[in-house]
Amino acid sequence: MSEEIVVKKILVTGASGGIGKAIAVACARAGYYVIVHYNHGKERAEETLSQIEAENGHGELIQFDVTDRTVCRQKLDELTEKHGALWGVVSNAGITHDNTFAGLSGEDWDSVVHTNLDSFYNVVQPLVMPMCRKKAGRIITVSSISGIMGNRGQTNYSASKAGLIGAAKALAVELASRHITVNAIAPGVIETDMIQDVPLDVVLPTIPMKRLGKPEEVAALAVFLLSEQAGYITRQVISVNGGMV
């Protein structure tokens, strides 16, 4: 009698493009069943899932607003009821609204903090207890080099990303005895739509490797941190930044 093959299931938020898409596709290639999250970018999320399926991977779409705590709880409870405890979650959804602090509106502060930082609680918290009962799991939050060193014109973004690092480190201590790892990835300047307006002649001199990072390079780290081989790595902040820090 052959044993049933158990496919580990993971959720990737903000998986409709950029780093999130790269992580979702790379995870599917590694054999995970990938739950591809989006909010407004349905067509792009469908493209992510289509690429996964075209490469003989498996997954599904899920839609919700990561800033809406009630909806997150409802959707994630339904997801857990359907699939059981997930093996992992990559909390990646994020936005920027840049301005100098003196000119930064309260709305732009709130929207960035709600989307980038509050979403960690809204998405991860409903998934923790099922993981604890199973005594296994991987939690990754995608922070930023801005959360480590701070960037001019990004007090809101830097604050939200630094908050993710603190949350990940604290949660890692709480969950270590349950064999659940919690780590933060802090990308540097990665070639995505988010940096399309950034002048390269200003940015590249600050990067020792003199090039932008690729989403796939961040995704490779995420796949490793999700793996069984990374079971003794927790409470860490690992930056993919070409030597900037």
Mark where each language-model region is:
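Conserved glycine-rich Rossmann-like NAD(P)H-binding loop of the short-chain dehydrogenase/reductase
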Residues: 32-46
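Substrate-binding pocket helix/loop in short-chain dehydrogenase/reductase
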Residues: 100-101, 108-113, 203
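C-terminal substrate-recognition "lid" of short-chain dehydrogenase/reductases
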Residues: 136, 214-240
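Conserved glycine-rich cofactor-binding loop
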Residues: 16-17
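Alpha-helical segment proximal to the catalytic Tyr-Lys
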Residues: 129, 173-177, 231
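Residue(s) in the substrate-gating loop at a strand-loop-helix junction
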Residues: 144
